[in-house]
Amino acid sequence: MTEGFTRQGADAKIIVVPEYDKTATVRGAMEVVAGKLKAIAYAAAPKGTTLSKALEGRGPLGSINFQTSSDRGQLFFPYVTGLLGLESLATHAAGLRMKTDVEQGYWFSISNRELLGVTGVEIGLTARADDPQSETNRLNEKGITTVFNSYGTGYRMWGNRLACFPTVSHIKNFEVAQRVGDVIDESIRRFELQYIDRPIDDALIDSLLGSIRTYLGTLQSIVGYSVDLDYDYDLVDAFSKGQVPLKYEYTPKLPAERISNASVMTRKYLANLVSQR
Protein backbone atom coordinates (compact mmCIF):
# COMPACT_ATOMS: atom_id res chain seq x y z
CA MET A 1 0.00 0.00 0.00
CA THR A 2 2.88 2.37 0.72
CA GLU A 3 4.06 1.90 -2.88
CA GLY A 4 0.86 3.35 -4.31
CA PHE A 5 2.37 6.68 -5.28
CA THR A 6 5.41 5.09 -6.90
CA ARG A 7 3.27 2.71 -8.94
CA GLN A 8 0.09 4.69 -9.58
CA GLY A 9 0.98 8.32 -8.86
CA ALA A 10 -1.42 8.55 -5.92
CA ASP A 11 -1.66 7.37 -2.33
CA ALA A 12 -4.69 5.71 -0.77
CA LYS A 13 -6.64 8.26 1.26
CA ILE A 14 -9.08 5.89 2.97
CA ILE A 15 -7.87 2.64 4.54
CA VAL A 16 -10.46 0.00 5.35
CA VAL A 17 -9.87 -3.64 6.30
CA PRO A 18 -13.31 -5.21 6.93
CA GLU A 19 -13.50 -7.90 9.63
CA TYR A 20 -9.75 -7.83 10.32
CA ASP A 21 -10.07 -4.38 11.88
CA LYS A 22 -11.92 -5.90 14.86
CA THR A 23 -8.64 -6.33 16.75
CA ALA A 24 -6.76 -3.45 18.32
CA THR A 25 -3.55 -4.71 16.70
CA VAL A 26 -4.88 -4.42 13.16
CA ARG A 27 -6.60 -1.13 13.88
CA GLY A 28 -3.34 0.25 15.25
CA ALA A 29 -1.44 -0.92 12.18
CA MET A 30 -4.05 0.75 9.96
CA GLU A 31 -3.50 4.05 11.77
CA VAL A 32 0.27 3.77 11.37
CA VAL A 33 -0.08 3.30 7.62
CA ALA A 34 -2.65 6.10 7.47
CA GLY A 35 -0.16 8.40 9.17
CA LYS A 36 2.50 7.64 6.57
CA LEU A 37 0.12 8.15 3.66
CA LYS A 38 -1.76 11.10 5.19
CA ALA A 39 -4.92 9.02 4.97
CA ILE A 40 -7.80 8.14 7.32
CA ALA A 41 -8.25 4.59 8.66
CA TYR A 42 -11.89 3.50 9.00
CA ALA A 43 -12.35 0.83 11.70
CA ALA A 44 -15.60 -0.78 12.89
CA ALA A 45 -16.48 -2.28 16.25
CA PRO A 46 -16.73 -6.11 16.11
CA LYS A 47 -20.00 -7.80 15.24
CA GLY A 48 -22.22 -8.28 18.25
CA THR A 49 -20.92 -5.22 20.08
CA THR A 50 -23.62 -3.68 22.27
CA LEU A 51 -24.14 0.04 22.80
CA SER A 52 -22.63 -0.10 26.28
CA LYS A 53 -19.62 -2.05 25.00
CA ALA A 54 -19.08 0.52 22.25
CA LEU A 55 -19.17 3.41 24.71
CA GLU A 56 -17.00 1.58 27.25
CA GLY A 57 -14.61 0.69 24.45
CA ARG A 58 -13.38 4.28 24.35
CA GLY A 59 -12.19 4.06 27.95
CA PRO A 60 -9.37 2.27 29.77
CA LEU A 61 -11.63 -0.64 30.72
CA GLY A 62 -12.88 -1.17 27.18
CA SER A 63 -12.64 -4.64 25.70
CA ILE A 64 -12.97 -3.80 21.98
CA ASN A 65 -10.78 -2.09 19.38
CA PHE A 66 -11.83 1.50 20.22
CA GLN A 67 -9.02 2.46 22.62
CA THR A 68 -7.32 5.06 20.45
CA SER A 69 -7.03 8.83 20.19
CA SER A 70 -5.51 8.86 16.73
CA ASP A 71 -6.16 11.78 14.40
CA ARG A 72 -5.74 9.26 11.58
CA GLY A 73 -8.58 6.95 12.59
CA GLN A 74 -12.37 7.09 12.50
CA LEU A 75 -14.48 4.64 14.49
CA PHE A 76 -17.79 3.12 13.36
CA PHE A 77 -20.63 1.29 15.15
CA PRO A 78 -22.80 -0.78 14.67
CA TYR A 79 -22.82 -3.29 11.81
CA VAL A 80 -25.55 -2.78 9.23
CA THR A 81 -27.73 -5.11 7.18
CA GLY A 82 -27.11 -5.08 3.44
CA LEU A 83 -27.13 -7.31 0.38
CA LEU A 84 -24.64 -9.72 1.95
CA GLY A 85 -26.23 -9.84 5.39
CA LEU A 86 -24.40 -8.11 8.22
CA GLU A 87 -21.85 -5.70 6.76
CA SER A 88 -19.23 -3.39 8.24
CA LEU A 89 -20.37 0.21 8.58
CA ALA A 90 -16.76 1.20 7.86
CA THR A 91 -17.04 -0.36 4.40
CA HIS A 92 -20.20 1.62 3.66
CA ALA A 93 -18.49 4.74 5.00
CA ALA A 94 -15.58 4.28 2.59
CA GLY A 95 -17.97 4.00 -0.35
CA LEU A 96 -19.95 7.03 0.82
CA ARG A 97 -16.73 8.99 1.27
CA MET A 98 -15.71 8.38 -2.33
CA LYS A 99 -19.20 9.18 -3.62
CA THR A 100 -19.25 12.43 -1.67
CA ASP A 101 -15.76 13.38 -2.86
CA VAL A 102 -16.76 12.95 -6.49
CA GLU A 103 -20.23 14.50 -6.36
CA GLN A 104 -19.74 17.35 -3.85
CA GLY A 105 -16.08 17.63 -2.88
CA TYR A 106 -13.57 16.34 -0.35
CA TRP A 107 -14.49 19.15 2.06
CA PHE A 108 -18.10 17.90 2.41
CA SER A 109 -18.90 15.66 5.38
CA ILE A 110 -20.35 12.18 4.92
CA SER A 111 -22.54 12.70 7.98
CA ASN A 112 -26.31 13.00 7.46
CA ARG A 113 -26.09 11.34 4.04
CA GLU A 114 -28.15 8.35 3.02
CA LEU A 115 -26.54 4.92 3.23
CA LEU A 116 -27.51 3.29 -0.05
CA GLY A 117 -28.07 -0.46 0.14
CA VAL A 118 -28.53 -0.48 3.91
CA THR A 119 -31.81 -2.06 5.05
CA GLY A 120 -31.25 -2.39 8.78
CA VAL A 121 -28.84 -2.19 11.71
CA GLU A 122 -27.52 -4.90 14.00
CA ILE A 123 -28.28 -2.79 17.07
CA GLY A 124 -31.25 -0.42 17.11
CA LEU A 125 -30.41 3.07 18.36
CA THR A 126 -32.59 5.99 19.39
CA ALA A 127 -32.05 8.89 17.00
CA ARG A 128 -33.20 12.50 17.28
CA ALA A 129 -31.21 15.46 16.02
CA ASP A 130 -32.69 17.71 18.72
CA ASP A 131 -32.01 15.35 21.63
CA PRO A 132 -28.42 15.36 22.96
CA GLN A 133 -29.23 12.26 25.02
CA SER A 134 -30.32 10.15 22.06
CA GLU A 135 -28.06 7.15 21.62
CA THR A 136 -26.72 8.31 18.25
CA ASN A 137 -25.66 11.65 19.72
CA ARG A 138 -24.17 9.98 22.80
CA LEU A 139 -22.01 7.90 20.48
CA ASN A 140 -20.92 11.01 18.57
CA GLU A 141 -19.92 12.65 21.86
CA LYS A 142 -17.45 9.79 22.38
CA GLY A 143 -15.93 10.08 18.92
CA ILE A 144 -17.92 7.22 17.36
CA THR A 145 -19.64 7.55 13.99
CA THR A 146 -22.93 5.68 13.77
CA VAL A 147 -26.22 5.26 11.87
CA PHE A 148 -29.11 7.70 12.23
CA ASN A 149 -32.53 6.18 11.60
CA SER A 150 -35.47 8.30 12.69
CA TYR A 151 -39.01 8.78 11.42
CA GLY A 152 -38.92 9.24 7.64
CA THR A 153 -35.13 9.62 7.40
CA GLY A 154 -34.03 6.22 6.19
CA TYR A 155 -30.56 5.04 7.22
CA ARG A 156 -28.03 7.86 7.32
CA MET A 157 -24.39 8.15 8.34
CA TRP A 158 -24.11 10.16 11.55
CA GLY A 159 -20.87 11.64 12.90
CA ASN A 160 -18.03 13.94 11.87
CA ARG A 161 -15.23 13.37 14.35
CA LEU A 162 -12.04 11.37 14.25
CA ALA A 163 -10.91 9.08 17.06
CA CYS A 164 -8.87 11.91 18.62
CA PHE A 165 -12.16 13.47 19.74
CA PRO A 166 -13.04 14.32 22.51
CA THR A 167 -9.43 14.28 23.76
CA VAL A 168 -8.32 16.79 21.12
CA SER A 169 -10.37 19.98 20.90
CA HIS A 170 -8.55 21.40 17.86
CA ILE A 171 -10.63 21.64 14.67
CA LYS A 172 -8.53 18.88 13.14
CA ASN A 173 -10.74 16.41 15.03
CA PHE A 174 -13.25 16.91 12.19
CA GLU A 175 -12.55 14.37 9.45
CA VAL A 176 -13.13 16.94 6.71
CA ALA A 177 -10.70 19.41 8.32
CA GLN A 178 -7.96 16.77 8.45
CA ARG A 179 -8.57 15.79 4.83
CA VAL A 180 -8.57 19.41 3.63
CA GLY A 181 -5.22 19.89 5.35
CA ASP A 182 -3.84 16.73 3.76
CA VAL A 183 -4.87 17.86 0.27
CA ILE A 184 -3.35 21.32 0.74
CA ASP A 185 -0.08 20.10 2.25
CA GLU A 186 0.42 17.40 -0.37
CA SER A 187 -0.42 19.72 -3.27
CA ILE A 188 2.03 22.39 -2.10
CA ARG A 189 4.83 19.87 -1.51
CA ARG A 190 4.45 18.45 -5.00
CA PHE A 191 4.23 21.90 -6.56
CA GLU A 192 7.47 22.97 -4.88
CA LEU A 193 9.47 20.26 -6.67
CA GLN A 194 9.98 22.56 -9.68
CA TYR A 195 11.76 25.09 -7.44
CA ILE A 196 14.21 22.66 -5.86
CA ASP A 197 17.88 23.54 -6.60
CA ARG A 198 17.09 26.86 -8.26
CA PRO A 199 19.09 29.90 -7.03
CA ILE A 200 17.72 31.52 -3.88
CA ASP A 201 16.88 35.07 -4.90
CA ASP A 202 13.97 37.52 -4.98
CA ALA A 203 12.57 35.92 -8.13
CA LEU A 204 12.43 32.48 -6.51
CA ILE A 205 10.83 33.74 -3.30
CA ASP A 206 8.29 35.94 -5.08
CA SER A 207 7.33 33.14 -7.47
CA LEU A 208 6.98 30.61 -4.66
CA LEU A 209 4.85 32.83 -2.45
CA GLY A 210 2.76 34.15 -5.33
CA SER A 211 2.03 30.70 -6.71
CA ILE A 212 1.01 29.29 -3.33
CA ARG A 213 -1.25 32.29 -2.71
CA THR A 214 -2.84 31.79 -6.12
CA TYR A 215 -3.42 28.09 -5.41
CA LEU A 216 -4.98 28.69 -2.00
CA GLY A 217 -7.13 31.45 -3.45
CA THR A 218 -8.77 28.98 -5.83
CA LEU A 219 -9.84 26.50 -3.14
CA GLN A 220 -13.51 26.16 -2.25
CA SER A 221 -12.56 24.10 0.80
CA ILE A 222 -11.21 26.98 2.93
CA VAL A 223 -12.54 30.29 4.24
CA GLY A 224 -9.24 32.17 4.48
CA TYR A 225 -5.46 31.88 4.23
CA SER A 226 -2.09 33.66 4.45
CA VAL A 227 1.34 32.82 3.01
CA ASP A 228 4.77 34.28 3.79
CA LEU A 229 8.33 33.42 4.70
CA ASP A 230 8.58 31.79 8.11
CA TYR A 231 10.09 34.55 10.24
CA ASP A 232 10.43 32.21 13.21
CA TYR A 233 13.61 31.11 11.45
CA ASP A 234 16.85 33.06 11.17
CA LEU A 235 16.31 33.54 7.44
CA VAL A 236 19.88 34.55 6.65
CA ASP A 237 21.13 31.40 8.36
CA ALA A 238 18.48 29.29 6.61
CA PHE A 239 19.34 30.72 3.17
CA SER A 240 23.04 30.07 3.85
CA LYS A 241 22.16 26.39 4.33
CA GLY A 242 20.15 26.21 1.12
CA GLN A 243 16.79 26.29 2.91
CA VAL A 244 13.75 28.45 2.14
CA PRO A 245 11.35 28.30 5.13
CA LEU A 246 7.74 29.11 4.25
CA LYS A 247 4.66 29.34 6.45
CA TYR A 248 1.08 29.17 5.29
CA GLU A 249 -2.06 29.30 7.40
CA TYR A 250 -5.59 28.38 6.38
CA THR A 251 -8.99 27.72 7.88
CA PRO A 252 -10.98 24.81 6.40
CA LYS A 253 -14.74 24.84 6.04
CA LEU A 254 -16.29 22.91 8.92
CA PRO A 255 -19.58 20.98 9.03
CA ALA A 256 -22.58 22.56 10.77
CA GLU A 257 -22.73 19.77 13.32
CA ARG A 258 -25.21 21.52 15.61
CA ILE A 259 -27.69 24.30 14.92
CA SER A 260 -28.96 25.99 18.08
CA ASN A 261 -31.95 28.28 18.40
CA ALA A 262 -32.88 30.85 21.03
CA SER A 263 -36.67 31.04 21.21
CA VAL A 264 -37.97 34.23 22.83
CA MET A 265 -41.64 34.92 23.48
CA THR A 266 -42.24 38.67 23.77
CA ARG A 267 -45.12 41.13 23.80
CA LYS A 268 -43.25 43.90 21.97
CA TYR A 269 -44.66 43.07 18.54
CA LEU A 270 -48.16 43.84 19.78
CA ALA A 271 -47.13 47.42 19.03
CA ASN A 272 -47.49 46.56 15.36
CA LEU A 273 -51.25 46.32 15.88
CA VAL A 274 -51.30 49.90 17.11
CA SER A 275 -48.95 51.35 14.48
CA GLN A 276 -51.06 49.95 11.65
CA ARG A 277 -54.13 51.92 12.77
Protein language model features and the residues they cover:
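Short, hydrophobic/π-rich interface segment
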Residues: 204-226
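Long, charged, glycine-rich C-terminal linkers/tails
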Residues: 223-242
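Residues in well-ordered beta-strands of folded domains
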Residues: 16, 228, 249
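Extracellular Cys-Trp
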Residues: 1-108, 112
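Long, contiguous, structured domain-core segments that constitute the functional module of a protein
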Residues: 87-211, 247-277
